[in-house]
From Swiss-Prot:
Residues 11-21 have a biased composition (Basic and acidic residues). The gene is ABCG33. This is ABC transporter G family member 33. Its main location: membrane. Expressed in roots and stems. Residues 1-10 have a biased composition (Low complexity). ATP 2 binds at G858, I859, S860, G861, A862, G863, K864, T865. The keyword Transport applies. It comes from Arabidopsis thaliana. The keyword Repeat applies. GO terms for cellular component: plasma membrane. The lineage of its organism: Eukaryota, Viridiplantae, Streptophyta, Embryophyta, Tracheophyta.
Amino acid sequence: MGSSFRSSSSRNEHEDGGDEAEHALQWAEIQRLPTFKRLRSSLVDKYGEGTEKGKKVVDVTKLGAMERHLMIEKLIKHIENDNLKLLKKIRRRMERVGVEFPSIEVRYEHLGVEAACEVVEGKALPTLWNSLKHVFLDLLKLSGVRTNEANIKILTDVSGIISPGRLTLLLGPPGCGKTTLLKALSGNLENNLKCYGEISYNGHGLNEVVPQKTSAYISQHDLHIAEMTTRETIDFSARCQGVGSRTDIMMEVSKREKDGGIIPDPEIDAYMKAISVKGLKRSLQTDYILKILGLDICAETLVGNAMKRGISGGQKKRLTTAEMIVGPTKALFMDEITNGLDSSTAFQIIKSLQQVAHITNATVFVSLLQPAPESYDLFDDIVLMAEGKIVYHGPRDDVLKFFEECGFQCPERKGVADFLQEVISKKDQGQYWLHQNLPHSFVSVDTLSKRFKDLEIGRKIEEALSKPYDISKTHKDALSFNVYSLPKWELFRACISREFLLMKRNYFVYLFKTFQLVLAAIITMTVFIRTRMDIDIIHGNSYMSCLFFATVVLLVDGIPELSMTVQRLSVFYKQKQLCFYPAWAYAIPATVLKIPLSFFESLVWTCLTYYVIGYTPEPYRFFRQFMILFAVHFTSISMFRCIAAIFQTGVAAMTAGSFVMLITFVFAGFAIPYTDMPGWLKWGFWVNPISYAEIGLSVNEFLAPRWQKMQPTNVTLGRTILESRGLNYDDYMYWVSLSALLGLTIIFNTIFTLALSFLKSPTSSRPMISQDKLSELQGTKDSSVKKNKPLDSSIKTNEDPGKMILPFKPLTITFQDLNYYVDVPVEMKGQGYNEKKLQLLSEITGAFRPGVLTALMGISGAGKTTLLDVLAGRKTSGYIEGEIRISGFLKVQETFARVSGYCEQTDIHSPSITVEESLIYSAWLRLVPEINPQTKIRFVKQVLETIELEEIKDALVGVAGVSGLSTEQRKRLTVAVELVANPSIIFMDEPTTGLDARAAAIVMRAVKNVAETGRTIVCTIHQPSIHIFEAFDELVLLKRGGRMIYSGPLGQHSSCVIEYFQNIPGVAKIRDKYNPATWMLEVTSESVETELDMDFAKIYNESDLYKNNSELVKELSKPDHGSSDLHFKRTFAQNWWEQFKSCLWKMSLSYWRSPSYNLMRIGHTFISSFIFGLLFWNQGKKIDTQQNLFTVLGAIYGLVLFVGINNCTSALQYFETERNVMYRERFAGMYSAFAYALAQVVTEIPYIFIQSAEFVIVIYPMIGFYASFSKVFWSLYAMFCNLLCFNYLAMFLISITPNFMVAAILQSLFFTTFNIFAGFLIPKPQIPKWWVWFYYITPTSWTLNLFFSSQYGDIHQKINAFGETKTVASFLEDYFGFHHDRLMITAIILIAFPIALATMYAFFVAKLNFQKR
């Protein structure tokens, strides 16, 4: 066998005898190496070494980026054919020496899954009232009282075998249990679901193996870190997943080849060895996966997110697949992996999976929504599900026969996959009834499932399951029994490398934080400047305030760590579930790499402030202060990271973080001295990091020699100051404090690690179900199905299209010589791209006409969405050239927004309103006022019925991928929201992506109905079935680079398109029953252009079709005789008052249904006030010394500042979510920015009032303030205005920053100024005159002024203040500058702050747009 291989190898793979001899010598050299080196050495081409050809011996672990790229390019030039050849060569090599691929047979018997749902009366909406009831019910449940719950069956007694070496397709309508089945089989089912039955891999139960490492589950949700590139994401996954059995297989193959004297193909040997080495930072397998999934073109592009430009949606979907298949697992469970991909790309991916399954004997189980016929034909087996049951599980060739036996037949031009998903639907089954002479009665899913089990195929499955799997036949490397693929030290290195990369990518955040810290330090040192600070008891109080302020600044500087941690948790939980790495390997790098950051920032603060403020000028004490501040900063970021891991969501974590900050402040011993705290609460002082910082810093300063001057009381000045604050400790407490801070850091990081290890993903929440829905599921399901008109097997228009007509003006849109450029990304410049601009659209000319439904198609990255954005005026960056006209007149964006609709690909909606409310809101704002309200409501209900949303009209929209509507329901809602606006021109970006065949047909029928009324409709579309594709009238086809290669009619059965391309020499003819959309994309691909040496764009530009289109564009670019340009009396459909009312209505509903935001802050205010009330119990009237007054002022200062901070931080996340929705609505011309902003501002008022009332009701009796009506009123007023300021500050910050993270960092700068200039740390008379103006523009200073002036400004009780006897009122005037006779002026100034912030918010919302398109 060896000699025959060598001879054939010589003939086929070596150019001449000399080369063969040289290779033989080089191979002999490799074979003489020790085993370890031999498995890492191979022959590769001499790339880039002059003109010298041949091969060289290299270590495959040291291949450079260019060598890896050229090696893959040589192996795979044309993906479909060359990938097949590569896999076959690998298989032949292994078979030659008798080595087999490992394989896995997956069995599941009588599998069932149930979910425990809470049953609620009425609508299952998370209102504030319902949430309060849930809290009460949870408490009852803990006490043993049974609550109203029901178990809902997701899967019911399903059985089957997923065989290796076969490609299996999972089909079924949304909600039938497909995802649950895939998760169950892959061992990734949520813990809160009850699972029964048996699942086995090669006869081993899931509890005997590690299913997450034996198989790979690929989710339908694309969760990735936005700051990493495509290549980095896949490389990290490859590194964590390891190489599995590849190393052992390679070792065995190499050993047997050496024993047999066989010389392998050098390219195959190099490839196999390179992908068999574990732990590499850069893997050749990554280059291979990038190539076969078409991601090589965006390998160095950042993934991006909604607010950061990155790869496209289709590329993200492929990246999700790539991230998992780069690993070594032999069983793949893939959930809707082709959503958002064009049919050609989808076909290519399925083809590659088929090759992997057939040649490497892999087990591949794929769920798809709309598989095109050619993709469907690639599968070997079909699993059809409905209502949690299996209707069919067997060979693809037999599925139609099964349904024919059941009395149903697939029409001639109907895709089989579409037929299978519709024939099990009660609404659509009748149209496929085979026996036309007999009446049709619905054949239920139960009946079909039982009939399948009675057939021979079903009996064979039962028979196979009854026989135990022969475990002795299992390949030793098939199953994984280890939780992790690499040694934990290697996984730790991988995680620390990624964390360092992310820190570099987020350098702006850290630079901004440092700049902010420097600014705060400059303010602090110039406020507390040494030239104004004497060594006496009064200024000793200022020194103490300054030390305390330093700890607070460094504490607040850790807040951004909370938001950055929360943002990455979803990716962490995904990778943790897939056993990429242990939680500690993720947690420790996040901790260790922040040490230099804490060191640097605390050093900057100490260096800037220490000598300028005038602390004791001894280097030893400078160093000791720096060490305490370093420990404080490191403890702070550890604490906030810990909070983020426990509370997981942005709003909850921010609320908890604010509460912890408040607790650390109040128990720090500054606002209330330790000696004045109630005895049973003093423990809070000793578990507080700020307390230890305060002790360490004060002992370090006030025990210095310069503070040892004896006082009349025979106590040193330093001891007197320490005693007044309850901090009279000896010097050894410095080291105790430093040790305690470092100990707390260890505790926080330990809790952080434990939380990551044991807490579930934040997406796992308890489901709710209404009593009506439960009754329907349990017994009256069939009766609840409305008698809707069935879908025909083709997309037909409604018999009465006129019912969709509301007054509108048909409009034509023409565009000529359209070009679009963007600045070249930095990543491309680094790859040698020298142009300044990157062209995404090139010389696009065309027209879209009324009543004509146009499809805009092209492969991923061809510029389809870009063209829509340019035409719709939605691009916020880049450079546009060319001319766009509307019915002959140049497009004016303001008026165009009134007559156009845009269905975005990303389905952005307000999460807290229902489906029907979303439509009513859109209709009310976008339909003209001449249409009366009754007609609008009827039209809304008509659209609900047309898009088949009436059954879920009361469902909450929810957050995509987390709660609320499913993907296909959200897509239909996106379409409905635009249709209900009755536009003349509608742009739809992939309206059928994410929908199953039936839902796609529903949407397209609605779109066709609307087009028939005379509207102009353009849709980008990726994977159309034959019937959806042929529902369009015209087609615009783009190639990569944004160049047009076809624009014209489709023709009957796509005849015009087929004829055009088949007339081009060399283009392959379309096969019978083949999808024209897929064929068209295949024959115009880049590989075909290269093979035929032609440019389809150039051919189109030289064609008669192009000339005819150009003439048509010229004709349509001229206005009709007597026509006039679009003109409206006002910019928006509704007047300002109607806009405000509509926005206020929606926001009021959203707030009422957002308990995570509103209930959290209301609860936070109550708990904070209660804790302060306990700690400062009855201190309000115990005013004997200035310290007693400071204590009471400290209580109000703490509540004013920290309740406000909590409001601001928790509001940021909520406002950012709504801002994304606002961008979409503003682009649609729904309202003015001022109407939206005012509605947002007004909606806050009742909730702020509730918080303020809570504050007064709790604080007043507990602290014991003077309880007259005027004093209570002014206290309520002061807190109300203060909280308005903080909430409106959050709105303002969101309006001026690009994302939540930057806003979170910027807010801490405001908090710093609000703190230092509040008049508590340093009273107004002591603030230097160059800074006193800042006191006047700080709202917290006026809040404290109003509160204390009203409360104590008229109290003439005498007190001992710094050794003098004064009245309370005179001390407030002299020390703080608070005047009782200026109450009204103070009140007016205070209310001006929220008004100013709200006005700035409205201004910047209108002027700034951070959405990059």
